[in-house]
Amino acid sequence: MSLFDWFADRRKEQSVVKVAQEPEEGDGLWSKCPECGQVVYRKDLLANASVCSNCGHHHRINSAERIALIADEGSFEAMDEALAPTDPLGFKDRRAYADRLRETQSGTGLRDGVITGMCRVDGIPMALAVMDFRFMGGSMGSVVGEKLTRLVEQATAKRLPLLIVCASGGARMQEGMLSLMQMAKISGALERHRQAGVLYMPLLTHPTTGGVTASFAMLGDLILAEPKALIGFAGRRVIEQTLREKLPDNFQTAEYLQDHGFVDTIVPRTQLKSTLANLMKLHGCLQGSAAV
């Protein structure tokens, strides 16, 4: 067998391997929990922040739903909504990057994988960014990096606490180095935010991996996570093959990282807003303390 044939066979093998994803909920009256199999009335599930009342499984939610759970009603004001990605490298693998962008934008109604803006939480002004995994796996490209950096700089200038809700597969490979450099750019802005003595809290949701984990997701004053969220850099299989040993079953979960000091606290989604408000008050962030 030639080397070319070997690679061709490998590609065929890899093409049938699918990443485990939560099934789409759809618009029906009932929803089945992928964790415990319980069938739940969809209206009740949504009323409970899309958390299974039987087993506590946190269903994946989109950026708009996340903002509605965190921000006081009517307080969120989006920033930089016009920013949209281009295709500077003319990248193409099985499909052209430009085609992927158009399709994803059409399917999600988003320009890119993060929404940023200012809001209030229990009356306290806060800068908020929410990544959306529906947009190319929440991957971090140049627009995601630029929007996050601008938000951090605004939070620093206005001395506002900052929350970034992370949900990402990592850097966007279709943008090459333009994607990777966002790690340093965002981290630099966060360092200036830290030097200003202002609170930054990342919330790690399922999944948070790759270059996002290796940069702004782990730079918080307080690192929060949702229960059982997948959090890591490289994939489990890659690590096992490198170390040549079996990893614990709960490896790369929020609970494992908390036990080993990488996560400060795990916050159930139904308690998130009150927890954020209490943490900000504890750090001296007062209601109406700054203009949003």
UniProtKB/Swiss-Prot annotation:
Pathway: Lipid metabolism; malonyl-CoA biosynthesis; malonyl-CoA from acetyl-CoA: step 1/1. Gene3D superfamilies: 2-enoyl-CoA Hydratase, Chain A, domain 1. This is Acetyl-coenzyme A carboxylase carboxyl transferase subunit beta. It is found in: Cytoplasm. PROSITE patterns: COA_CT_NTER. Zn(2+) binds at residues 33, 36, 52, 55. Keywords: ATP-binding, Cytoplasm, Fatty acid biosynthesis, Fatty acid metabolism, Lipid biosynthesis, Lipid metabolism, Metal-binding, Nucleotide-binding, Transferase, Zinc, Zinc-finger. One of its GO terms (cellular component) is acetyl-CoA carboxylase complex. Binds 1 zinc ion per subunit. It comes from Synechococcus sp. (strain WH7803). A zinc finger (C4-type) spans 33-55. It catalyses: N(6)-carboxybiotinyl-L-lysyl-[protein] + acetyl-CoA = N(6)-biotinyl-L-lysyl-[protein] + malonyl-CoA. Residues 29-292 form the CoA carboxyltransferase N-terminal domain. One of its GO terms (molecular function) is acetyl-CoA carboxylase activity.
